[in-house]
């Protein structure tokens, strides 16, 4: 499978209540069957609201004064705030991301009908160009990277593999590539501190190991190690965010970072094996790293 997307695609994140307009007004959104069943079986105080404000015959959200029944006065979605992001229907979860699928090809774009997407598109200073990923999706690449590394590492502390499994299962199991991309975008939006932490972590790995290349000439290996370690921590962050029902704080981040660091850096065997895999295993090629960055 090949998939293409414009170079500015990853710049988008929903600005929610700060948006000058709302995508939930004047648009009769059709609810997909899977989500409709979730609404039918939803338990809790919000059940009556779902039952009353959905047109079950037409499979759409009711509208009042051309506004979705679940759009509150702050232009935020009550389904999201009361029931959680997992209860959003496919259209609400994906918009303004637009996907067209053909045989062997998936085209992903941002809809011009979204003010923030329009701003990003029209603010580009260079001609637009498309990026293409081939074969493995980013989710598949990450899964294969974990499967390559984890069995090769000695476990220093009891519970480490269980710690990984709980978080990675939350991220990878029962989610397609579109859900995976959305979940990571959602985390980045609701946890903006990650952008600063990402830079701090990348600098840490570079600062700690890059100059060691004067002894073994493995410059690219050190760089790849820094990138992969930072990306792995991000995957664990998103998995923790999902495991904790869309909650994540600094203590979560601290726990992930120090436990990951201990398992890797407190063992010469693990450090050497990690760098050996960066150097010799094709799954960590620069081509693959560019696909997931």
Locate the predicted segments by residue.
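Secreted/processed peptides and extracellular or luminal domains of membrane proteins
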Residues: 20, 25, 29-30, 74, ...
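Conserved aromatic-histidine-acidic binding/catalytic patches
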Residues: 80-84, 102, 217-225
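N-terminal, Lys/Arg-enriched amphipathic/low-complexity engagement segments
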Residues: 27-65
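Structured loops at beta-to-helix junctions and adjacent beta-edge loops in soluble globular domains
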Residues: 17, 27, 71, 80, ...
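Internal, well-ordered alpha/beta segment that forms a basic, Gly-enriched binding/recognition surface
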Residues: 83-134
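Short, compositionally biased low-complexity segments
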Residues: 11-18, 127, 201-206
